[in-house]
Every structure is written in structure tokens, then in C-alpha cells.
A protein has these predicted regions:
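Cap/lid segment of the alpha/beta-hydrolase catalytic domain
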Residues: 91-153, 205-217
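Catalytic histidine neighborhood in serine/cysteine hydrolases
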Residues: 269-286
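Primarily recognizes the serine-hydrolase "nucleophile elbow" in alpha/beta-hydrolase
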Residues: 102, 156-228
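Short beta-strand element of the alpha/beta-hydrolase
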Residues: 64-67, 76-86, 97, 106
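Gly/Ser-rich "nucleophile elbow"/oxyanion-hole loop immediately N-terminal to the catalytic nucleophile
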Residues: 72-76, 126, 131-178, 196
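Surface beta-strand/loop "capping" patches
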Residues: 306-347
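Short beta-strand/loop motif that positions the catalytic acidic residue
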Residues: 242, 248-250
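N-terminal cap/lid segment of alpha/beta-hydrolase-fold proteins
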Residues: 20-76
Length: 367
């Protein structure tokens, strides 16, 4: 499904806690190493960022990141890719190197607060915290107590650093993320508006208050705290500013980001958007284009083709299915497909609910 182009994004509110970090190139504090191998130059470094504290104050920190690019980019302007790791992950070189081999300049930062905190090479408060601590908590005395402030700020600063690279075309910036990284690219796409051209979200979502990881924690907060947390940290509240062409790959039986939150996220994206649900799997996509092998360094095999489509201005056009209104008799469902490729095949998956309600993870989808 794809929507018409939206109007220019509204300005980010001046008092938004992320406004100071949405623009401006962060200082590279340390270059740890540089190496060229197999036609790819890999730079490992730390850059200046910000983190919160138990006292609700903002402090300085340093974020570890890996930048990969083709070995010789002199005189070139290449597309840029921000690679966001998932929950329990950290910056790793596999993704950036894979994108560099496809002609991108790519950056993969630590995203402290939802990663492998104790293994990260960042200089951050979270390296002494357990994974999952202080993510979805009452924002008291200020929202800066929440470690998602650290993570989102690191993502913003990494994007700004990528955008400033001399061999990067600032008009061709994209981002990809898996799980919590899918949350991150959704959040950043809203905060960064027209600066992001294409976004791929594998399994993540916004609208945590509906049916996603952290929903129970949000329900336990009092209303004022919950509303503050959602305003500051829920990716769904940011999507009115998103202007990226968006592709969501989600699992219909996901245990973490379930269809109600995923569909609310999709509906809130005001511009070009596509979605695909994989049946009978949690946090895995079994359909063509998904992560069919775990050692694949890019999150899903459809990504290179999707981003090539975005950066080519939407060419060639992707298939767009549209439902056709028919008289319902329990057996007929019709749809048309615009831009349908030759020899295409289509099929339906249906979930029949029993008398007793069943959670999304336990549904059976029959083809």
C-alpha cells in the first residue's frame, strides 16, 4: 500500500527534549582504528552525545560507532545508511560492511539503553546497567531518567555524523532497524522529517500503549506519567513529521510488537508506505524477502531492492494491492494489484478465532 505525498513536516517544538540533538554534527572524540579490507574502509570511533541520569539531568557521554564505506570514494557522493541494532545488540561491523559493498556509506552506533549494555564500547551510564532497566518507567523527576533518551539521542547524533561525511549525498539518507531497532528508525524518521528518504522497520513499532513490549508497564503508570512518556518516547507520536518512504516487515504472531501496535504505526505514517505480515512466526519473517538465513548481515533480503527503489525516485513502481468491495458471503475476497509483475501469484492467510479469545502469538494462520 502506498499513499500520496504529504505536505512539508511541521517544525519540531523548541521545548522537545530531542530538539537540541536533531541537528548539528557531533564531535568525534576518538578514532579507535581504521582498516581497509576487501574493498571496504572501516573506521571505528567514538562521538560526543548526551545521556540522562537518575537525578533527571543531562550529562555528556561518548558513543561507539562503526563507519564503513567503499575504499575509494574520492569525488563521489554516495547514499548513506544508518544501521540500528535490536534489543540486546550493539554496534557491529557486519551490517555496515555489507552496505558499503553495495555502494553506501553506512554507520552502526551503539544505542545504549536497549542493547548489550555491559558489552558496549561506549562511555555511558548504561554500561553498568542490566538490559531492559529504566526503559519504560515513570518520567520523574524529568524524562531524562529514561534510558531511551540516551538511545534516541545516540541515534540522532549518528545520523548527523553520517549526513556530514564528505562522501555522502545528504539527499539520499536511509535507515534500517530490527526489533527495538525498528522502534528506533520509526522514532528517528519522525524526528528527522524530510532528511530521511527511506526507512525499513523489521518487527518494531510505535504505539506501545496498545499491544507491544512495555504495554503493561505503561498501564501501571498514572495517567500524567503515561502521557508524558508517550509524548517523549513513543515512536507513534512522532510520525506526523515522518516524510520517508516506509517499509514495515512484521510478524503476525509476534510476542513483542503485535498487530494492533504495528497497524496503528502504519496508519500514522502520512507518506509512501508499504507493509507485509509474515504468518505463524514470532519475530521472524518466513515470506520471500525476509531474513531467510541468520548469518545474512543485512536484516532482510528485500532491503537492497527497496532502498534502490526509494533512491531512484520510486522506480520501478512497486505492486500496490487494493481491496475491491464485494457482497460478503463468507467466501469471496477480491483485490486488484497495480503494477503487478508478470507471473505473479497471490494467496490468502486466514485466522479463525475460537470461542475463547486467543493472543496474537497463539493464532493459527491457514493458507
Amino acid at each position: 500500500m502506498k499513499c500520496a505525498a504529504a505536505a512539508p513536516a511541521p517544525a519540531l517544538e523548541k521545548d522537545d527534549l530531542f530538539a537540541p540533538y536533531a541537528k548539528g554534527v557531533p564531535k568525534v572524540t576518538t578514532v579507535i582504528s581504521e582498516e581497509t579490507k576487501d574493498g571496504v574502509k572501516v573506521t571505528k570511533l567514538r562521538f560526543a552525545s548526551a545521556e540522562g541520569s537518575k537525578e533527571g539531568e543531562v550529562k555528556d557521554c561518548e558513543i561507539y560507532a562503526i563507519i564503513a564505506r567503499p575504499a575509494n570514494t574520492a569525488g563521489q557522493k554516495l547514499p548513506g545508511m544508518l544501521v540500528c541494532h535490536g534489543g540486546g545488540g550493539m554496534a557491529s561491523e557486519g551490517g555496515p560492511i555489507a552496505w558499503a559493498k553495495l555502494g553506501y556509506v553506512a554507520i552502526a552506533p551503539d544505542l545504549p539503553g536497549y542493547g548489550a549494555n555491559d558489552k558496549m564500547l561506549s562511555i555511558s551510564r548504561v554500561t553498568k546497567m542490566q538490559f531492559g532497566a529504566d526503559q519504560i518507567i515513570p518520567p520523574k523527576p524529568t524524562p531524562y531518567v529514561c534510558v531511551l533518551f540516551d538511545a534516541v539521542t545516540a541515534g540522532l547524533r549518528a545520523f548527523n555524523l553520517l549526513e556530514a561525511q564528505p562522501d555522502v549525498d545528504p539527499q539520499k539518507l536511509c535507515m534500517t532497524g530490527i526489533s527495538w531497532g525498528g522502534y528506533m528508525v520509526t522514532m528517528l524518521s519522525g524526528l528527522l522529517d524530510e532528511r530521511v528518504k527511506g526507512t525499513f522497520n523489521l518487527y518494531g513499532s510505535g504505539f506501545y500503549q496498545l499491544d507491544a513490549i512495555g504495554s503493561d508497564a505503561l498501564k501501571k503508570m498514572d495517567e500524567a506519567d503515561r502521557n508524558t512518556w508517550l509524548k517523549c518516547f513513543d515512536a507513534g507520536t512522532r510520525l506526523n513529521r515522518c516524510r520517508a518512504t516506509f517499509l514495515m516487515y512484521s510478524a503476525a504472531n509476534d510476542a513483542f510488537f503485535k498487530p494492533p501496535s504495528v497497524m496503528a504505526t502504519f496508519d500514522a505514517i502520512p507518506v509512501g508506505k508499504y507493509i507485509c505480515f509474515g504468518p505463524n512466526k514470532s519475530h521472524y519473517m518466513s515470506l520471500p524477502g525476509g531474513p531467510v538465513r541468520w548469518e545474512y548481515p543485512i536484516n532482510a533480503e528485500i532491503e537492497p531492492a527497496f532502498f534502490a527503489h526509494v533512491l531512484a525516485g520510486g522506480n520501478p513502481p512497486l505492486p500496490e494491492p487494493n481491496a475491491v468491495a464485494v457482497t460478503r458471503n463468507g467466501k469471496v475476497l477480491k483485490f486488484t494489484v497495480k503494477n503487478c509483475p508478470d507471473r505473479a501469484a497471490g494467496w490468502f492467510y486466514v485466522s479463525w478465532l475460537p470461542d475463547q479469545p486467543r493472543g496474537w502469538e497463539a493464532r493459527d494462520w491457514a493458507r
